[in-house]
């Protein structure tokens, strides 16, 4: 009996809430703007070039024609840690895969210190 009474009360309360909110199409906090806010000297957000809070590139930094490998390697080299030296020239890395693997091993082992004598990376 109590369960039926509780279900009935929930149903009645739900119908009251639905009827009361029928008159409003939008929630109270939603505000329509007829015209975009225009402040002198500022561009609207959809026109702004700094949407992602990144720096704007100068024309000197922009590289128009990149091949597939360069398109991948350029961002990696830009974000490369400054403390690590590149031992092998960039052109040699593209030509010879064996030298690339040996350079990678030498940089990893150089960072390990005494563990490089064991021959394990962990």
Curated annotation (Swiss-Prot):
Keywords: Amidation, Cleavage on pair of basic residues, Neuropeptide, Secreted, Signal. The modification Phenylalanine amide is found at residue 53. It comes from the Eukaryota. It is found in: Secreted. One of its GO terms (cellular component) is extracellular region. Residues 24-40, 57-122 form a propeptide. The keyword Hydrolase does not apply. Its main location: secreted. The keyword Iron does not apply. Residues 1-23 form the signal peptide. GO terms for biological process: neuropeptide signaling pathway. Expressed in brain and ventral ganglia but not in the retrocerebral complex (at protein level). Neuropeptide stimulator of juvenile hormone synthesis. This is Allatotropin. It comes from Camponotus floridanus (Florida carpenter ant).
């Amino acid at each position: 009996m109590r369960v039926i009474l509780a279900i009935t009360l929930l149903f009645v309360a739900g119908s009251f809430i639905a009827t009361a909110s029928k008159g409003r199409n939008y929630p109270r906090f939603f505000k329509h703007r007829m015209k975009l806010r225009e402040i002198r000297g500022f561009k609207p957000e959809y026109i702004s070039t700094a949407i992602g809070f990144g720096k704007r590139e100068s024309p000197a930094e922009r590289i128009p024609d990149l091949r597939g490998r360069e398109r991948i390697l350029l961002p990696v080299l830009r974000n490369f840690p400054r403390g690590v030296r590149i031992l092998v020239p960039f052109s040699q890395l593209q030509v010879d895969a064996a030298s690339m693997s040996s350079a990678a091993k030498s940089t990893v082992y150089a960072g390990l210190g005494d563990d490089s004598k064991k021959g394990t990376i962990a």
